[in-house]
Amino acid sequence: MSDSVTSCLLLPILETMPMPVITTLFMFYYPFRTGSTNFSAPIVSPLALLSGQLSIKGGKIMPISRHRVNFFNPMPEFFAIDMAMPLSLPLPEGPCVVLFEALPEPPLWQWLLAAAQVNSAYPETNAAYASNASITSIQHTSKKPLQIIMLLKDEAELNALAMDASHPLSPFAMAASHIKGGQRFHLDDNCWLDFYLCEPNKAATLATFDKASIDVLICPKGEFEQAALELAHQGSILIGDTKPDMPAALPIKPPFKPRDISIVGAGVAGASLALSLLRRGHKVTLYCADAAPGIGASGNRQGAIYPLLTPEDDHLTRLFVPAFLYAKRFVESLAHHPLPFDFCGVLQTGHDERATERIEKLLSKTWPKQVAVRVDADEANHIAGVAIDKGGIYYPQGGWVSPAKLCEAAIEEAKTMGLECHFDVNITSITRADEGWRLNTQTGEIDAHELVLATGHRITELAQTKSLQLAPFRGQVSHVPTRGKLEQLKTVLCAHGYFTPRDASSGSHCMGASYVRGDTSVEYREQEQQENLHKMQESYPGKDWVEYLDISEGSARAGIRMVSRDHLPMAGAAPDVAAIQTQYQAIGHGPKGAQYWQTHAAPVHPGLYIFSGLGSRGLSSGPLIAECLADSLSGTLPVLDGDVMEALNPNRMWLRKLKKGKALD
């Protein structure tokens, strides 16, 4: 869009605004699909953080909030229809201008560069744009930070970078002094990262990508003196010489304010969340009723890491694919601690006709090769190291880890970053205080500014959380000593039950697990020990290695998992169920009730958050959900899509009914 056209569009609106409320804008282009044509809509992200949803109706953008964003539509013939898009970007508190431009699919960052040409009165700055290029490093010699935005068009490449906790450019590993920020944005098939390279003469090394998989936009953050941007591009140096006129300041995040957050629980949920929050600069205090981390459901010797996939592209799949890939890197990032693990892969086979049909449905979908691949019987035998003689689905990046040791490692790592831990603290109740929450314990009271409950199966023991729609499931895991051909097993087997390779630290395997609803006892049960053995015999009948499964020593461990109705975890603000019921009684259900709940936020307990319901796949999902919850508490965009985050909302069970006008049970 030319400067003259832009001025014609902006001036009539700018002239009506008081100067103090004209906000500096930074524009991201989101493609809208209308029929067979793609359009792009730039939206703004100034300083004030406000999450919600934008509805586009007849040329006006209205966030569902107390703030209003004015929308100027220069092409009403293209956008007369109603549209909506999820929004987790900051919105301004005062009036602002949004340009809405319709173009026939140019490269995404050409749009972004064009959007920067807003007002020629701003200082001239340099920018560089590289499309479909293999970039190995970026370095700058400017005196002020450099903003780097990377568009990754291949999901596997995205996961290789964005989900790698050890990679210097990962949003989860921004400890290097010269790299700051780090947010991941995702819409449809486009994913991109945004971060800052802060210190001059410092280089940021990128992974080598296929040239068709990445676009990079590099531009100054603020005013630069003698900006010089250099990209190492396929062995040659490219100097960015395009000079669009850009605003003098492009804030895309609100100023960071450290928060004082208390966590109750030291299992996978609490330990990983503590680490995620500390990495973002918050003050974290952890309380646990047990004497050490990982005593509850997270206390098993070995636990399998593999995704919970479905044939549909539903919330479970969209959660577990990235969560599974990140879990591996999370574990590996703690490998310098005493931590038994082995990413030897997970082989899933059918144990009956129904299970086999389900695996076939899973394999009918195309998965990234890093996630899941089909294997035949011969390949399965080679992968397992023992006779399987049936095909299935193989998760090459799966494996096992000691959950108890993982919790210990995460806590020890968090202590190096300032975590304050208090064990043997039994919290009997919590009450709202003037500046947060008061925790009532067996020895006295503790004040907390903000509170996250990650207490496993005890989550429903408090008055504020007793109505959460979670159910406890007892699970007993059998310990099997290594004998005979069991030593040859090279991968985790998963069928009617699961069986792990030998753990060198204990000299045994884990086999399990029972699944008893509503039972919170952790006592040993011989019946469940026999059931675990029978499941493995049923899964691999007649195989000689199964004969070496010995449970005669009666060694096992039982834990209690918390599971939701839809098998999705819960992470987010704690719902105020009493207030929801009060509003429901006043409004009723039906069309009137549906309309109300579609436009009003459900009540929550201020400053109180839930992290629970990880079920039997907490090792696979917990670390990434912790990252997303930490992002939400930090006022930054979570890695997961907005609708997936909504699906994790502890309020979801009630809201699904209320938004449809259905009666509550």
Curated annotation (Swiss-Prot):
Pfam families: DAO. GO terms for cellular component: cytoplasm. Residues 264-665 are annotated as: FAD-dependent cmnm(5)s(2)U34 oxidoreductase. Its EC number is 2.1.1.61, 1.5.-.-. It is found in: Cytoplasm. InterPro entries: FAD-dep_OxRdtase, FAD/NAD-bd_sf, tRNA_MAMT_biosynth_bifunc_MnmC, tRNA_S-uridine_synth_MnmC_C. Residues 1-243 are annotated as: tRNA (mnm(5)s(2)U34)-methyltransferase. Its cofactor is FAD. GO terms for molecular function: flavin adenine dinucleotide binding; oxidoreductase activity, acting on the CH-NH group of donors; tRNA (5-methylaminomethyl-2-thiouridylate)(34)-methyltransferase activity. One of its GO terms (biological process) is methylation. It catalyses: 5-aminomethyl-2-thiouridine(34) in tRNA + S-adenosyl-L-methionine = 5-methylaminomethyl-2-thiouridine(34) in tRNA + S-adenosyl-L-homocysteine + H(+). Keywords: Cytoplasm, FAD, Flavoprotein, Methyltransferase, Multifunctional enzyme, Oxidoreductase, S-adenosyl-L-methionine, Transferase, tRNA processing. Catalyzes the last two steps in the biosynthesis of 5-methylaminomethyl-2-thiouridine (mnm(5)s(2)U) at the wobble position (U34) in tRNA. Catalyzes the FAD-dependent demodification of cmnm(5)s(2)U34 to nm(5)s(2)U34, followed by the transfer of a methyl group from S-adenosyl-L-methionine to nm(5)s(2)U34, to form mnm(5)s(2)U34. In the N-terminal section; belongs to the methyltransferase superfamily. tRNA (mnm(5)s(2)U34)-methyltransferase family. In the C-terminal section; belongs to the DAO family. PANTHER family: SARCOSINE DEHYDROGENASE-RELATED, TRNA 5-METHYLAMINOMETHYL-2-THIOURIDINE BIOSYNTHESIS BIFUNCTIONAL PROTEIN MNMC. This is tRNA 5-methylaminomethyl-2-thiouridine biosynthesis bifunctional protein MnmC.
